[in-house]
């Protein structure tokens, strides 16, 4: 099995990258892909860059160049569920765009023409992630993760997301684009991220302060998930 792992920012991939043995680097289209073994498992780790376009382009390059069997999207996210705090884990059962609106033509809010309203995460990957969470005794929430090309830092943006997606547990800027690409390539995916901030008016300050905490937690989860998947 080869596992593809995607993070947007240097801070979100550096801890994992440093653990990859026999590491080789592919630089293409503004993305970097690091291949090798993580705990004896073949992996391809992508640093995509921030935002939906960068994430989609990077995911496509990763799938074409390295042909992983599954994709794990990792990194940080803003918490929307009331039970979440910095360092907690969110696991996707579905991903949707929060900034797409073609409702004038009868589509659901967040749905693009020719696409499902939401992209479902692979049930086996979700179950494996939840098994790791239990083993590590982490606080976690499973549910809808929404993505858009905006850092949500204020009551107006937050209110809009909560109005359109009251069930959403977290918000970030890449996961749904990655899920979209995986859907088109028919490759199973799951989003496993750690909370760096709770989406409110001070979220930019929290993000800067706690990104390192989120990176450590998400790295811990991904390492354990990779080993879990390799064991079958």
From Swiss-Prot:
Gene Ontology biological process terms, A to Z: L-methionine salvage from methylthioadenosine; L-methionine salvage from S-adenosylmethionine; purine deoxyribonucleoside catabolic process
Keyword Metal-binding listed: no
Keywords annotated in UniProt: Amino-acid biosynthesis, Hydrolase, Methionine biosynthesis
Enzyme nomenclature, EC number: 3.2.2.9
InterPro entries with a match to the protein in the record: MTA_SAH_Nsdase, Nucleoside_phosphorylase_d, Nucleoside_phosphorylase_sf
Pfam families recorded: PNP_UDP_1 (PF01048)
Catalytic residues (positions): 12 (proton acceptor), 197 (proton donor)
GO molecular function: adenosylhomocysteine nucleosidase activity; methylthioadenosine nucleosidase activity
Residues where substrate binds: 78, 152, 173-174
Subunit structure: Homodimer.
NCBIfam families: MTA_SAH-Nsdase (TIGR01704), PRK05584.1 (NF004079)
Function: Catalyzes the irreversible cleavage of the glycosidic bond in both 5'-methylthioadenosine (MTA) and S-adenosylhomocysteine (SAH/AdoHcy) to adenine and the corresponding thioribose, 5'-methylthioribose and S-ribosylhomocysteine, respectively. Also cleaves 5'-deoxyadenosine, a toxic by-product of radical S-adenosylmethionine (SAM) enzymes, into 5-deoxyribose and adenine. Thus, is required for in vivo function of the radical SAM enzymes biotin synthase and lipoic acid synthase, that are inhibited by 5'-deoxyadenosine accumulation.
Protein name, as recorded: 5'-methylthioadenosine/S-adenosylhomocysteine nucleosidase
Underlying gene: mtnN
